[in-house]
Swiss-Prot record:
Function in brief: Catalyzes the oxidation of 5,10-methylenetetrahydrofolate to 5,10-methenyltetrahydrofolate and then the hydrolysis of 5,10-methenyltetrahydrofolate to 10-formyltetrahydrofolate.
Protein name in the entry: Bifunctional protein FolD
InterPro entries registered for this protein in UniProt: Aminoacid_DH-like_N_sf, NAD(P)-bd_dom_sf, THF_DH/CycHdrlase, THF_DH/CycHdrlase_cat_dom, THF_DH/CycHdrlase_CS, THF_DH/CycHdrlase_NAD-bd_dom
Record family assignment: Belongs to the tetrahydrofolate dehydrogenase/cyclohydrolase family.
Pathway info: One-carbon metabolism; tetrahydrofolate interconversion
Protein's organism: Azotobacter vinelandii (strain DJ / ATCC BAA-1303)
Length: 284
């Protein structure tokens, strides 16, 4: 068996086209373009790349984008004041604080300061709670994007045994909630899990999101499983690889995401989708 690739790049491009069409229709109706404010603190190279991609995405779909590139010395109070101003700005539908932040800043406090209806990353406790209560409002972008990728396969998720490798607040935990909502039986593994191979090998669906290259061995994959690799790790030789041993896993799985070009593009596209949703449904 050779797995079919889930082309996140192509699916994300299609989603961006749909969003751009919606924005164009809004403009024709005399409505404003959705607005996204992106806050970057410091000069972390990876964060700068991510933010530049997000701003480019906004331009592509016709969003109003506002950039706040702040020095690493920015204080907690200054950031809280900025978020307060953006919360009250009617031209802004979404506020994004790029993580990680400098060590002197409390990310949790800052993310909680964002109004839940402008929390387009979906990290606010209110939005996570809504998801847990089966009433999602603004859903975390990476899990939301993964659900779109899974839908593209045509697979019936009801009753599938799903194993999530990694329990972060950004991916693993909200991913488990999304899968529960979709009717899966979910196991979440983490750094204290014993017999990881056993949990993976019985899964019909594997979501690998631990941030450790090659953690999930191809021989663990159940024949015919769906494998979603969230990890993106740069090796010493410069190659980008996921958390799953791709070649050996692809020989056993039915569907698999590549790295890069799988989950990453969908995360960015879902940020746009959340911002459009906020503009159309929450800020009318």
């Amino acid at each position: 068996m050779t797995a079919k690739l889930i082309d996140g790049k192509a699916i994300a491009a299609s989603l961006r086209q749909q969003i751009a069409q919606c924005v164009a229709e809004r403009r024709q109706q005399g409505l404003r373009a959705p607005g996204l404010a992106v806050i970057l603190v410091g000069t972390d190279p990876a964060s700068q790349v991510y933010v530049s991609h997000k701003r480019k995405d906004c331009e592509e779909v016709g969003f109003h984008s506002r950039a706040y590139d702040l020095p690493a010395s920015t204080t907690q109070g200054e950031l809280l004041s900025l978020i307060d101003r953006l919360n009250e700005d009617s031209a802004i539908d979404g506020i994004l604080v790029q993580l990680p932040l400098p060590v002197h800043l409390d990310a949790s406090l800052l993310l909680e300061r964002i109004r839940p209806d402008k929390d387009v990353d979906g990290f606010h406790p209110y939005n996570i709670g809504r998801l847990a209560q089966r009433m999602p409002l603004l859903r975390p972008c990476t899990p939301k994007g993964i659900m779109t990728l899974l839908q593209s396969t045509g697979a019936n998720l009801y009753g599938l045994d799903a194993t999530v490798v990694g329990a972060s607040n950004i991916v693993g935990r909200p991913m488990a909630l999304e899968l529960l909502l979709a009717g899966c039986t979910v196991t979440v593994t983490h750094r204290f899990t014993r017999n990881l191979a056993e949990h993976v090998s019985r899964a019909d669906l594997v979501i690998a999101a631990a941030g450790k290259p090659g953690l999930v061995k191809g021989e663990w994959i159940k024949p015919g499983a769906i494998v979603i690799d969230v990890g993106i790790n740069r090796l010493d030789d410069g190659r980008l690889v996921g958390d799953v041993e791709f070649s050996s896993a692809a020989a056993r799985a039915e569907w698999i995401t590549p790295v890069p070009g799988g989950v990453g593009p969908m995360t960015r596209a879902c940020l746009l989708e959340n911002t459009l949703h906020a503009a159309e449904q929450l800020h009318r």
